[in-house]
Amino acid sequence: MDIQMLGFLVFFGFMAAFIDSVVGGGGLISIPALLWTGLPPVTVLGTNKAAAVMGALTSFVAFVRSGRVDMWLIKRLFPLSLLGSGFGVLAVRMVPPDILRPLVVVMLIAVLVYSVLKKDWGRENHYAGLSARLLLLSCLVSFSFGFYDGFFGPGTGSFLLFAFLLVGFDFLGAAANARALNFASNISAAVLFTYFGLVDFSYAIPMGLAMIAGAWCGARMALSRGTGYVRPLFILMTTVLIGKQLVDLFK
């Protein structure tokens, strides 16, 4: 790999993780950058996951240290997201993931419309714990979005953040807890892609190191600027995701 390609991957890895560390959607930047290297598409996905898990760990640690992650809840949901993602990666080898694209577009539009119309939603933290019924539902949601992230992926960050908003977290708290579950699904996917020989570490390592820096800066920015920063970024990235999925749907 020449110095120009290295600089290219480092720059876009940093930018992808900076955004992904708060609201997700970093794959919109990192995957096209990796495709530019000429790697096969399936290896691009594996290499991206291997790099992204480094950034995901970094933002997870930053949010945990800030006290924004509800460890009682995450300890129960983390293993389910990990397990779901593993099943998702296995399923993608048997079923074409594009069958989900129309449903994903509809769901992302619903998330966007609701978030835009509810202007005061997520400004303050109203989370006061979960009933047994809501905890069971949260476990199911965690497994399902873990599976989705391993199987298809686009919009996982938006869906997870939205789910935490629904149970009462503010935007910053929702982003922090969503990052925790996204880290879990990234671990499982990265391990399995590596096992199947679908990771090119000559690209994954430099991009991953850049993602560590980007994720740390992104998480610190979110923590310092708060909910007023996270909400518009969430709306922007969800809008971009919808546009990207519509382009792919009608391509």
Across the structure, where does each feature detected by a protein language model lie?
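Selective hydrophobic functional segments
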Residues: 46-99, 106, 186-232, 236
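Residues within membrane-spanning alpha-helices of integral membrane proteins
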Residues: 6, 49, 104-108, 112, ...
